[in-house]
């Protein structure tokens, strides 16, 4: 066999695409970075695939009533944070204990659309939970 045939050639090696054409915003960021490179106000770009977690939840604010209104008439009541959390939200502070598992399918609770929240099937790669966990409701297996 010819030695040059043994070498695998990259068919895309001759193609050159400028980065600014791939991401138009990148060119603008590079221009801004070059003009104010000595500025300490710049923040580093995020380095992960995920967006940062919010540090706090937005709280409802009281809406002032119309002018001349007495008392709290026309004002929206301020609700506490517990009222804003949905009962099935796995990220709420009122979630079930971490690692709570069952020997079989968990019992159906009030308000459960599905009889369980199982993330243990082999086709679900969304988490690494133990069998029959109640952490998520994203599994495609439904046991009725």
Curated annotation (Swiss-Prot):
Positions of region (Disordered): 51-105
Entry superkingdom: Eukaryota
GO molecular function, one term: identical protein binding
Tissue occurrence: Expressed in the stratum granulosum, in skin and oral epithelia (at protein level).
A Gene Ontology cellular-component term: extracellular exosome
Ranges of compositional bias, category Polar residues: 78-98
Gene Ontology biological process terms in this record: biological process involved in interaction with symbiont; establishment of skin barrier
Main subcellular location: other
Annotated compartments: Cornified envelope
Xref: InterPro entries: UPF0574 (IPR018904)
Subunit structure: Interacts with LCE1B; the interaction is direct. Interacts with LCE2C; the interaction is direct. Interacts with LCE3A; the interaction is direct. Interacts with LCE3C; the interaction is direct. Interacts with LCE4A; the interaction is direct. Interacts with LCE5A; the interaction is direct. Interacts with LCE1C. Interacts with LCE1D. Interacts with LCE1E. Interacts with LCE2A. Interacts with LCE3D. Interacts with LCE3E. Interacts with LCE1A.
Function (record text): Component of the stratum corneum that may contribute to epidermal antimicrobial host defenses.
Family according to the record: Belongs to the CYSRT1 family.
Name of the protein in its database record: Cysteine-rich tail protein 1
Organism the protein comes from: Homo sapiens
């Amino acid at each position: 066999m010819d030695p040059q045939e043994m070498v695998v050639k990259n068919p895309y090696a001759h193609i050159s695409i400028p980065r600014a054409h791939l991401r138009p915003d990148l060119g603008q960021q590079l221009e801004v970075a070059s003009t104010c490179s000595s500025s300490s106000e710049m923040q580093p770009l995020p380095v992960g695939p995920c967006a940062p977690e919010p540090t706090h939840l937005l709280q409802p604010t009281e809406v002032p009533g119309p002018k001349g209104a007495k008392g709290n008439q026309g004002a929206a009541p301020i609700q506490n944070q517990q009222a804003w959390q949905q009962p099935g939200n796995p990220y709420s502070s009122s979630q079930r204990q971490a690692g709570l598992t069952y020997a079989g399918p968990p019992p159906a609770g009030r308000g459960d659309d599905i009889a369980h929240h199982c993330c243990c099937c082999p086709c679900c790669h969304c988490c690494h939970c133990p069998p029959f966990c109640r952490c998520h409701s994203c599994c495609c297996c439904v046991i009725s």
